C-alpha cells in the first residue's frame, strides 16, 4: 500500500479550474477552506490547487488539519507547510510549524482543532498569498458544529465544498456567498478503517524511526493535558486509606479540589465500587507509550514524543523523540493516543481518563 491516500493529478473535473480562477481573483492574502465527507478528494484537491497556484506565481501555504490521515507528518497534529516547488504528495512537504492535538479523531478536542487552525492560519498569512486549509471528513452530527466553529474562527475568503448529495448544507448555511460547490471526482477512492490504520502505522513508524530517549526534569517544564500534576500530592494517611478501601497499590496520587486522582495497581482481583465523582483512577500499566507534544512558549508544537516512564519521586519523565534540539521546549502536553515507535497503535484514551 502507498504511504499516502492522495497524489497530484491533472486529471480533474472541469470545475477545479474554475476554483483556481476564483482564488486568483481574491484579494490577497486569502484563506481557502476545503471541506467534504471522508474520501471525497479533499487532499487531492489541495495538492492540485497548490501546484496550479504556484505555477501562476502565488506564494502558497497549506494547513493539513486532517489529524487522523495526515499527509504532512506527524499524525495527531495540525501542520503548516509552505510550498516552494511543485510536489506530488503532502508527504513531500516539510512542515514549518505544528499545533498539537494529541489524538487521531476530533471528538472531545473541538477547542484544540479550532485554535490550532486559527493560530496556524494567522502565521501562514504573514508569508503567503494563498492559505489552503485541508480539513477532516467529520461533517455529520457534532462535525457540523466543528466545521462551523472553524469557519467562524478562521473567516475564510472562500470555501470549496466537495459534495455528492447536498450533505454539506447544514455546514454551509449562511456562507453560500463565499462557497463554491465542487463535484466529487469519480476517481475518489474509498479507504477502509483497516487501510487507514495501516497508513497511519507507516507514518508513525517513519516519524519515530530515528528517535532517542531523553529525560526531562518536571521542575523545568510545564506539564499539561493531564491531572497528574494538578492540585496537591496526597499524604500518607490519605494514601493508606484509599489503598485499604479499594485494594490498590497507589503509585501516585493528587487531591484536586474535593476529588482524588490516583495512579494505581490492583493489589487483588475482584470488583470495586468507585464513585468517580470522588476518586478518579488510572491504571499504571497504561502510563507508557502515550503520545506527548513538545510545546514552545508560543504554544506551537516543535515535535512529538512517546512517554516511556515517569519517576514521580524524582520528578523525571522519560520520553522517546526524534526532536534533536529541545532547547525551546517549555511545555510537555499529554495526548490521548497510545502508540509505539514501530507505529502500532495501542488504543485511544478518553479525554477525562488522565
From Swiss-Prot:
It catalyses: a 5'-end dephospho-2'-deoxyribonucleoside-DNA + ATP = a 5'-end 5'-phospho-2'-deoxyribonucleoside-DNA + ADP + H(+); a 5'-end dephospho-ribonucleoside-RNA + ATP = a 5'-end 5'-phospho-ribonucleoside-RNA + ADP + H(+). ATP binds at residues 36-43. Its EC number is 2.7.1.78. Its cofactor is a divalent metal cation. GO terms for molecular function: ATP binding; ATP-dependent polydeoxyribonucleotide 5'-hydroxyl-kinase activity; ATP-dependent polyribonucleotide 5'-hydroxyl-kinase activity. Signal peptide: none annotated. This is Polyribonucleotide 5'-hydroxyl-kinase PYRAB01840. It comes from the Archaea. It holds the Pfam family CLP1_P. It comes from Pyrococcus abyssi (strain GE5 / Orsay). Coiled coil: none annotated. Keywords: ATP-binding, Kinase, Nucleotide-binding, Transferase.
